[in-house]
Amino acid sequence: MATSLRGLDAGPGSLRRWILICFAALLLLPPRPNLGYNENYTEPVCGTPWWPDNLEESHHWPWEASLQIEDKHVCGGALIDRSWVVSAAHCIQGNKEYSVMLGSSTLHPNGSSWTLKIPVGDIIIHPKYWGRNFIRSDIALLCLETPVTFNKYVQPICLPEHNFNFKVGTKCWVTGWGQVKQHSSAQLTPAPELWEAEVFIIDNKNCDSIFHKKTLYPQVVPLIRKNMICTTNYGEDLCYGDPGGPLACEIDGRWILAGVFSWEKACATVPNLSVYTRITKYTIWIKDQVSHGAQLGPCRTSWLLLLPWLLQLPVSL
């Protein structure tokens, strides 16, 4: 049997008080613990990962993130602090419920004690994102509902200063669960294990010229802009590899997030070219968003933003 609110003698003042009490209770709830992350605890400096003894066999990318919908991998990402992951804006598919997996190089970790699966509490897409034709400002920030506990399997990558210049020829690494050496007609399914490929930064003008040869756009229309960064490996790259995945470069002993994977030329062609969102063009924006989020507390920001609106609702139901 339905109960009328009128029968509860709830006036405008009391209803607003109840709303405030409910929101206060939600905000005071302790965050859900990240079980399994007390072993090998470290308080890392960004961009200084733990490496296996044999570097020839494999590297270790503790900032690598898998953005998932209903436990299915959709995009890559990079952990930049306890609560924030950087990914590509075009990965966000409307009003979906996302989670982020951290601490594993496989998409199916089988209950590994160091693997985290954390719901995404808030998503911020850059206001100048353009998703048609050649993508622009392809960057998004994912705020985790629960801050992570760092250990040797989960650590952040460094953000570059906004005025840092990644020189042409710089050797970097691209990682992700994308296909490797697959024909363009192959079915696009994620690889079960994390791939890595060594790539080199190339000049934007050279990259732009190569792309123009494959399009009908006139030369006066730039395809590769200043807020993008271009790489090649002349034959071995992450073909159809993870959108949103990190381009990581080791600079003076620290690993720096140079780019976020955005789009690429077909990997059946040579040279293999990949285009990334250039992080230096967005460092200030990222830091502003992270700082603002820290002031609001854990990523229940969507609830907080709704609070003023809820308090203005009419009470006659």
Curated annotation (Swiss-Prot):
Protein name according to UniProt:
Inactive serine protease 45
Q: Which residues form the Peptidase S1 domain?
A: 44-291
Q: Which PROSITE patterns would you find in this protein's record? A: TRYPSIN_DOM, TRYPSIN_HIS
Residues carrying a glycan: N40, N110, N272
Q: What species does this protein belong to? A: Mus musculus
Q: Which UniProt keywords apply?
A: Disulfide bond, Glycoprotein, Secreted, Signal
Q: Which residues form the signal peptide?
A: 1-35
Q: Give the superkingdom in one word.
A: Eukaryota
**Which cysteines are disulphide-bonded?**
C75-C91, C172-C249, C207-C230, C239-C267
Q: Name one GO cellular component term.
A: extracellular region
GO MF annotation terms = serine-type endopeptidase activity
Q: Where in the cell is it found?
A: Secreted
* UniProt record similarity statement: Belongs to the peptidase S1 family.
Q: Does the keyword Transferase apply?
A: no
CDD domains per record:
Tryp_SPc
Could you provide one GO biological process annotation from this protein's UniProt record?
proteolysis
